């Protein structure tokens, strides 16, 4: 989805800085944007490291003078399986990218935006930030955390009377390679599925993503949300009823029921 956002921004003659931990993929994305007439720079970044986030901000300012839109979008599926079968490393690695990465991004970039009193932050959460499916505990934990961080940030900026906007992007199934991103782990690390339940969930997720929304549609949705200063951005309406049903279960103090898209 990040590349789709960059493509859409470049169509508006926005200067684009892309980041990725995979240098070859990053170079290909930068060359594509430039090949289509856009201005783009690439910075190899491990979002789980605070120092890399600081370097990304510095490189962006060095390249283009300022930063106006920040998209905290790095994503992996992470390890999946029974929550008690996952190792501490499984949790740590997934949360490091999905949650710590966003925390580092907020702490690094938001002060710059607040100081100039303009700009926008796009935080990529997920439907998994509102619905808890089984056998994906690290991902669910991270996305619930990211959603509440975005909402907290929104309230704080309003209290501060800042002109900086926030969008919380909550994708459903989008045709991306997020599952394959787990392969970027260091050699010898535990794979994405740690048990038979993980295998089943991985197969389901891959099928669902392959039939999911075109990332280019999401890129347009993000651009529109920024333009309209819209906070909640859900990529489709398939999960509206399940989210409402979960909220009602909480209000009624009833046991959770497994939710599926309508």
Language-model features: locations:
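The beta1-alpha1 cofactor-binding region of Rossmann-like NAD(H)/NADP(H)-dependent oxidoreductases
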Residues: 23-24, 44-56, 88
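Active-site helix of classical SDR
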Residues: 106, 142
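Conserved glycine-rich Rossmann-like NAD(P)H-binding loop of the short-chain dehydrogenase/reductase
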Residues: 12-28
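Substrate-binding pocket helix/loop in short-chain dehydrogenase/reductase
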Residues: 81-83, 87-93
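SDR active-site lid
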Residues: 159-233
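Canonical Rossmann dinucleotide-binding motif of NAD(H)/NADP(H)-dependent dehydrogenases/reductases
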Residues: 1-17
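Residue(s) in the substrate-gating loop at a strand-loop-helix junction
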Residues: 126
């Amino acid at each position: 989805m990040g590349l789709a956002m960059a493509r859409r921004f470049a169509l508006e003659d926005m200067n684009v800085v892309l980041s990725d931990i995979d240098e070859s993929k990053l170079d290909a994305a930068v060359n594509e944007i430039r090949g289509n007439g856009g201005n783009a720079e690439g910075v190899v970044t491990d979002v789980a490291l605070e120092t890399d986030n600081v370097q990304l901000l510095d490189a962006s300012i060095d390249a283009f003078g300022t930063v106006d839109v920040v998209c905290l979008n790095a994503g992996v599926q992470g390890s999946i399986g029974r929550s008690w079968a996952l190792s501490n490393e499984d949790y740590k690695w997934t949360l490091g990218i999905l949650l710590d990465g966003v925390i580092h991004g907020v702490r690094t970039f938001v002060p710059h935006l607040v100081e100039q009193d303009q700009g926008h932050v796009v935080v990529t959460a997920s439907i998994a930030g509102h619905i808890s499916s089984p056998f994906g505990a690290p991902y669910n934990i991270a996305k619930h955390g990211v959603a509440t961080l975005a909402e907290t940030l929104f309230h704080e900026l309003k209290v501060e009377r800042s002109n900086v906007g926030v969008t919380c992007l909550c994708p459903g199934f989008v045709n991306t390679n997020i599952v394959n991103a787990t392969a970027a782990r260091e050699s010898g690390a535990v794979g994405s599925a740690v048990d038979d339940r993980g295998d089943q969930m991985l197969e389901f997720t891959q099928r669902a993503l392959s039939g999911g929304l075109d990332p280019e549609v999401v890129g347009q949705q993000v651009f529109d949300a920024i333009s309209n200063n819209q906070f909640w951005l859900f990529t489709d309406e398939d999960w509206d009823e399940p989210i409402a049903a979960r909220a009602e279960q909480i209000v009624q103090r009833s046991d959770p029921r497994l939710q599926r898209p309508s």
